[in-house]
């Protein structure tokens, strides 16, 4: 086996503290160079069949018409299985090793006093999620972990009752946010030494040129996250491959200046949701995002590992310049606990977090071999 395999085997790490445990390996890297797992719709774990529909629900379910009301009554329970992308709380996800949280925020039609997270249907209060993040970082075991907190969509009013309420919610983590004037290309070791508390990269989707919240980075300026909108594993992998092939046409060197989110997620069609009502029709029929993730996550892990460890894209060897982190940074999944893959020439089976830990050790070894270039991820 390669020396990196010995490093992985001999390095003591825990999912709750893996970044700190790998400090000697990833300290010279920027957050844009580290491989880590992200959770798609991280706060959707609270969606249930009784959850009201939110602002991002399909249009035919919204409105005040009798027809829309009837559809909401009929589809609320069915849609819940497809709206719930995670089954663990945010605290449990962080303890599992997730370091990127994708979230949407809106008002709740049944509780105007608080802001809620949502994915087509209302989930848990935003305050609960932020308290989970706060508790995780207050825990001495995980106090040195970095988190990317991405509020992709805000379904809020422009007045103080909307965005103002959102900003006040964020204030409970104000001493945890990494200032926006700190470049994403900053080595993690510098961030560890500069502050014992600031561990969160706050990203907010906004149509404005400047963020109205001082600690927030504008999503379009600091992150690449492309949704390929495919509902089959084959088409999803093809689309993800094509994103990298397109980026390779414009090679870049140095440290990537933006975070890159690989959206390794299946997009259900209305037909999938309808057929899911009758799961006994065929073994091929799935009735929830959980069922889909159970089937596709293992293949997605194998794809991500093959690309990053072996430099293989659909069986073809590719050379990825140091300045491109396409599919080499944040690996976003539904049901992050599902799926495993073989690493280290098939000698070890691990989950997505363990895979990323090994890839970071592998990357660090390449960086050590050639300190004049950003790390490469090819095993051989």
From Swiss-Prot:
Q: Which domain of life is it from?
A: Eukaryota
Q: Topology relative to the membrane, per the entry? A: Peripheral membrane protein
Q: Which UniProt keywords apply?
A: Lyase, Membrane
List the InterPro entries hit by this protein, alphabetically: PI-PLC_domain, PLC-like_Pdiesterase_TIM-brl, PLipase_C_PInositol-sp_X_dom
Kindly report the protein's main subcellular placement as a broad class. membrane
Q: Which reaction does it catalyse?
A: a 6-(alpha-D-glucosaminyl)-1-(1,2-diacyl-sn-glycero-3-phospho)-1D-myo-inositol = 6-(alpha-D-glucosaminyl)-1D-myo-inositol 1,2-cyclic phosphate + a 1,2-diacyl-sn-glycerol
A single Gene Ontology CC annotation of this entry is: membrane
Choose any GO biological process term that the UniProt entry carries and state it.
Answer: lipid metabolic process
- Classification via PROSITE patterns: PIPLC_X_DOMAIN
Can you say where in the cell this protein is located? Answer: Membrane
Residue ranges occupied by any PI-PLC X-box domain in the UniProt entry: 31-205
Assembly mode: Monomer.
Write the protein's name: Variant-surface-glycoprotein phospholipase C
Q: State the organism named in the record.
A: Trypanosoma cruzi
């Amino acid at each position: 086996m390669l020396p990196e395999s010995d490093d992985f085997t001999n390095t003591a790490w825990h999912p709750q503290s893996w970044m700190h445990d790998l400090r000697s390996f990833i300290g010279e890297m920027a957050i844009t160079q580290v491989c880590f797992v992200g959770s798609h719709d991280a706060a959707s774990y609270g969606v249930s069949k009784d959850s009201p529909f939110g602002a991002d629900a399909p249009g035919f379910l919204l409105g005040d018409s009798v027809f829309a009301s009837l559809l909401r009554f009929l589809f609320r329970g069915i849609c819940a299985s497809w709206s719930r992308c995670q089954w663990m709380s945010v605290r449990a996800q962080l303890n599992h090793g997730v370091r990127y949280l994708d979230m949407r925020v809106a008002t709740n039609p049944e509780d105007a006093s608080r802001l809620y997270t949502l994915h087509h249907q209302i989930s848990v209060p935003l305050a609960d999620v932020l308290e989970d993040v706060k508790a995780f970082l207050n825990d001495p075991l995980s106090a040195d972990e970095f988190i990317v907190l991405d509020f992709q969509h805000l379904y809020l009013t422009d007045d103080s009752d909307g965005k103002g309420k959102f900003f006040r919610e964020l204030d409970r983590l104000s001493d945890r946010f990494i200032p926006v004037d700190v470049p994403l290309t900053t080595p993690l070791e510098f961030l560890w030494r500069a502050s014992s508390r600031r561990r969160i990269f706050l990203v907010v989707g906004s149509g404005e040129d400047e963020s109205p919240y001082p600690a927030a980075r504008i999503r379009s300026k600091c992150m690449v996250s492309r949704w390929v909108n495919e509902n089959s594993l084959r088409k999803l992998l093809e689309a993800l491959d094509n994103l990298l092939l397109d980026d390779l046409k414009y090679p870049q060197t140095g440290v990537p200046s933006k975070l890159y989110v690989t959206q390794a997620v299946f997009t259900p069609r209305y037909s999938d949701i309808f057929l899911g009502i009758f799961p006994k029709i065929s073994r091929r029929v799935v009735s929830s995002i959980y069922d889909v993730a159970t089937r596709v996550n293992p293949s997605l892990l194998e794809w991500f590992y093959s690309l990053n460890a072996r430099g293989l894209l659909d069986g073809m060897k590719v050379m990825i310049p140091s300045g491109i982190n396409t599919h080499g940074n944040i690996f976003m999944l539904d049901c992050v606990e599902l799926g495993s893959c073989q690493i280290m020439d098939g000698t070890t089976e691990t989950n997505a977090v363990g895979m990323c830990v090994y890839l970071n050790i592998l990357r660090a070894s390449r960086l050590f071999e050639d300190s004049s270039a950003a790390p490469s991820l090819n095993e051989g």
